[in-house]
Amino acid sequence: MNSNSTIGRTTLGESDTISLSFSEPSSSLNSRSTDVVFASTSTLVPQQGSLTSLPPVSSTATPTYYSTSLTYDETLHTSIDVSSTSTLVSSTDSSSSSEQDTYSSQYDPATSSYSIITPSMSIFSSTSPMSSSSSITSEWSSLTSTTPTLSSSATSLSSSWSSLSSPSSLLVSSSLSLSLSSSYSDTKLFSFDSRSSIFSPSTPTVISPSYTYLSSISATSFQISTTSELSSSWFSTISSPSTISNKDTTFPSSSRNTSTSFYSSSLSSTNDFSTISKSSKLSPSASSSTVSISTISVPTSSSVSSSSSKVPSNRPSSSSSSDDTTSAYSSTYTFQSLQSTTSSSIPPTTQTPSTSTISTSPIPTSSQVFNTVAISSSEDSKTIYYFYTQTYDITDSSTTFVTGLPTTIAVAKSEVTSFSAPSSTITADMSFYQHWLDGSLDNNKNQGTSKTNTGTIVGSVVGSVGGILICVLVVWFMLVRKRKAKRHFKENDSFCHEIGRRTGFPTTAQAKEASLQAQDSGSQQRNTETASANNPFSNEFNFKARGNPPPVPPPRNVTAMNGSFQNMRSNFMDQENRFSYGSSFTYSSLGSSTQGGFSTLSSNSIRLGRGLDNDISHDERNTVQNNSQGFLREII
C-alpha cells in the first residue's frame, strides 16, 4: 500500500525543532565456564613382593562429571541524536508510506553552531552564519542468545550432545538529511578519519532531498558437540592359602578403564552495518561545492581459543587404571561494520562505535593430586597392617609427574594407639618407579635383608668359635710355660745341684736314679752300691747309712802337739784341699789360734771325723773319708 501526500506551507517567523536519534554502539559478551570434578576414593592392596600374603582390601571409586556450561549474551546498540532549531521561512513536506520523507526549507540568515560528538573522536566546534545543533545517538537493537547449561553425570560407555542455533535479524530504517540555504560565504576544513570535507558557498545554495537506507544484518551460529567414552580396566591378583591342600589359589581378573572426553564448540557471528546515501543533487547559482565521502569501517575481529586437558595414567601394582581426558575448545567471533555516508554541505559524520568483549573460560587442564589419603587396616593377633596411598613425585631428565603408590605398614598392637598416613610427597627417580612396576622393589629389599642377616649369623658364629680357640691356646701356652719354668727352677737352682756341679757330679740325675733304684730289685741295689763308692753323694738322702759320730778327743798338750800339728796341716792341705770344706778347716780351725789350731772360744775342740784326727794313720784316714759323708753333711 503506497499513498503520497504533499503539504505546502509558507510561514514566516515560525520556529521549528527537528530531532533525530540513531543509536549504534555494538557490544558482545561471551562467557564460558566449565566444571569438571573427579572424586575418587580407592583402597588398594599391593599384590607384589613380600606383600602378597596380606589380607585383601576392597576398592571403591566414585567419579562425578559436570559438563561444560556455556552462556552467550550479545547486545548491539547504536544511537545517533541530531537536533536542530531554526526559524522557518518556507517549508514543503512530501511524504509516502514507503518511509521516504522529503523536506525542503528556506531559512533567513542566522547564526548556527555545529557540534559533532563520537565515542572515538574529540569534540569539534565551529561558528557559521547559520544556527544548528546536532548530536549523535539514534536507534538501538538488542540480540541476546543464551545456550542451555548442560550438566550430566556420566558413567555410561559413550555419550554425545550437539546443538546448533543460528539466529539472524534484519533491521532496515531510514535516515534524514537537511537541505539548508544560506546567503553567507564560509569556508571550513574538517578532518574525520583522515578524510576531508570542504564547503565553500558564495551564494545561496539549494540542496535537494537525499535518501538514506540503514540496514543491519546479524547472523549467529553456535554448535557444541561433546563425546565422552568411559571404560574401566583393573588388574588384581589375590592369593589365599588353602588349609586342606596346602596350596595357594590365585584369582586373576582384569578390565580396562579409559575415559576420553572431547568438547568442541564453534561460534560464528557476522554483523554487517551499512549506511548508503544516494540521489544527492546540487542546485547552486554560481557557487562551488565539494562533496566528500566519509567511510568508517570497523575491522573484522576474530577470537579463537582452544584448550586441551589430559590426565596421565596412574598404574599401581595391584590395579591399573588409565584415565585420559582430552578437551578442545574453539570459538570464532567475526564482527564487521561498514558505514558509508554521502552528503553535501557539512554533513554530521558519524562513526559507529563498536565494542566487543569476550570472556572465555575454557576447560582447564586438570591433573590428579592425591591430597586425601584413604587408610584401611587389617590385623591379626599381634600386628596391625595399615594400607594407604603414598604420593610420589617421579622426576627424570625429560619428564616429571606425580603418582600414588599403595604402601603397607606393619605395626605391633602394643606400640600404636592411632595412625595417620603421611601427607608429604616423596621424590624418587625413574628407576625407583621402574622397579616398582616390575615388582622387583620389595624382592630386592627382602633379598638384601636376608643376605645381611645370613652374613651376620655366619660372622658371629665364626668369630665366636675363633675367639674361644684363641683363648684356649693362650691359656694352654701360659700353663705349660709356667710348669716348665717351675720344673727348671727346682732342678737347676737347688742347693744340692750347685754342690754337685762344683764337684763334677750333678745331683739331679743321681737323685732320680736313687729313687728308682730303691724300688728295683737287689741286683740294681748292688749296682747302686758300686756306683756309690765312686760318687760321694749317692747316699746323700739315705740317712740310715750314716756312720756314728766320731769320739770326742781328749785334751792335748799344746807344746807337744805343735810338731804333729804342722805335719797334719801339711798332709791335710796336700790331700784334702780339693774338698769344699778345706778352706773352712784351714782358716777357721787351724789358723784361728796360736794354740795348736784349737779355738779359744770353745772349751771343746772341733771333731773332724774319722780319718782326719791326728791319731789315725794315713791309710785309715783315706778309707774313712771314702765311706763317710764329710763335714758338709754334718752341717746340713
Swiss-Prot record:
Localization terms from the record: Vacuole membrane
Isomerase listed as a keyword: no
Superkingdom classification of source: Eukaryota
Membrane topology: Single-pass membrane protein
Keyword terms: Glycoprotein, Isopeptide bond, Membrane, Phosphoprotein, Transmembrane, Transmembrane helix, Ubl conjugation, Vacuole
Annotated region (Disordered), positions in chain: 1-33, 87-109, 246-271, 299-326, 339-362, 510-551
Disulfide bonds: none
Bias (Polar residues) ranges: 1-18, 510-541
Glycosylation sites: 4, 257, 492, 557, 562, 626
Cellular-component GO terms for this entry: fungal-type vacuole; vacuolar membrane
Induction: During G2 phase of cell cycle. Promoter is bound by the FKH2 transcription factor.
Phenotype upon gene inactivation: Leads to cell death when overexpressing the camptothecin mimetic TOP1-T(722)A mutant.
Location of cross-link Glycyl lysine isopeptide (Lys-Gly) (interchain with G-Cter in ubiquitin): 512
Transmembrane segments: 457-477
Residues carrying Phosphoserine: 628
Low complexity compositional bias, start-end: 19-33, 87-108
Stated family: Belongs to the TDA7 family.
Name of protein: Topoisomerase I damage affected protein 7
Source organism of the structure: Saccharomyces cerevisiae (strain ATCC 204508 / S288c)
Gene behind the chain: TDA7
